[in-house]
């Protein structure tokens, strides 16, 4: 894919990073839906930046102010939400769990960021999955190839990350039903196949493995994600929670196996 074919926001992020980070950049990568089966109506644009040093507070502030201007809200195709992650390479070589992230911009943090609270460094199990995904399936926008900067990640580290992330995901179900169901689908798919895929493809795979009472619910989540219908969960809350519990048990069983 030619860089001119990317959404305008991708080139804007590259420009912002080059201006603010200057000589710190080792590589910039596009990953996620954009590099798999294409961006869906509610998809973020996922970008990983690997640097050769930690970020100062002034750099965090400058990055955040600029990204707030170009990142859009969920469902806005013309101005998509951005998820921009910055990692200092020395924090992941050698690999540690949970990995350290220098900075993450995401629309769920907009209120805090607009109030002047800029993303800080943190250790996050989900970063292991992000790194695995970027190493396996990303487009290099600038610098070295991802496999040159991200060490090989054993699959047991992915299982560990899923194990750590599962309780928090389940607890966020109320009000985020579609995303939780689709993320559980992707966890299940990944644990069986040792591959990563988009949420709708994972859901299609999981639907074939569900007891007959559950496929309509997951189909609703999948079709809403694809923009084919509007999903409403209040009237099926009990059944949807039962589906979550069923999927959780399948995932936990897979996590127990070596």
UniProtKB/Swiss-Prot annotation:
Question: Domain of life here?
Answer: Bacteria
Q: Which reaction does it catalyse?
A: spectinomycin + ATP = 9-O-adenylylspectinomycin + diphosphate
Example GO BP: response to antibiotic
The signal peptide, as residue positions, is none
Alphabetized, the UniProt keywords read:
Antibiotic resistance, Plasmid, Transferase
Effect of inactivating the gene:
Loss of spectinomycin resistance.
* GO molecular function, a single term: adenylyltransferase activity
Q: Which SUPFAM superfamilies match?
A: Nucleotidyltransferase
NCBIfam families per record: ANT_9 (NF012212), PRK13746.1 (NF010309)
Q: What does this protein do?
A: Mediates bacterial resistance to spectinomycin, is probably a spectinomycin 9-adenylyltransferase.
Name listed for the protein in its UniProt record: Spectinomycin 9-adenylyltransferase
């Amino acid at each position: 894919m030619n860089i001119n074919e990317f959404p305008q926001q991708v080139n804007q992020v590259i420009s912002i990073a080059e201006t603010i980070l200057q000589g710190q950049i080792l590589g910039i990568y596009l990953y996620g839906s954009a590099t798999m089966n294409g961006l869906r109506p509610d998809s973020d644009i996922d970008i990983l930046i690997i640097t050769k040093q930690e970020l100062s507070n002034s750099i965090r502030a400058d990055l955040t102010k600029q990204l707030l201007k170009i990142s859009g809200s969920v469902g806005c195709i013309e101005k998509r939400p951005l998820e921009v992650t910055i990692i200092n390479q020395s924090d992941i070589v050698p690999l540690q769990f949970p990995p350290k992230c220098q900075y993450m911009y995401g629309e769920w943090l907009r209120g805090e960021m607009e109030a002047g609270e800029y993303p800080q460094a943190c250790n996050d199990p989900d970063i292991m999955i992000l790194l695995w995904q970027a190493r396996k399936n990303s487009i290099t926008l600038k610098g070295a190839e991802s496999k040159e900067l991200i060490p090989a990640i054993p699959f047991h580290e992915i299982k560990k990350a899923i194990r750590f992330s599962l309780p928090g995901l389940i607890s966020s179900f109320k009000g985020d039903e579609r995303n939780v169901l689709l993320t559980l689908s992707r966890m299940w798919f990944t644990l069986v196949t040792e591959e990563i895929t988009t949420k709708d493809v994972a859901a299609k795979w999981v639907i074939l493995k569900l007891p007959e009472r559950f496929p309509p619910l997951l189909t609703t989540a999948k079709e809403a994600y694809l923009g084919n219908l509007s999903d409403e969960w209040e009237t099926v809350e009990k059944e949807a929670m039962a589906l979550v519990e069923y999927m959780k048990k399948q995932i936990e069983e897979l996590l127990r196996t070596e």
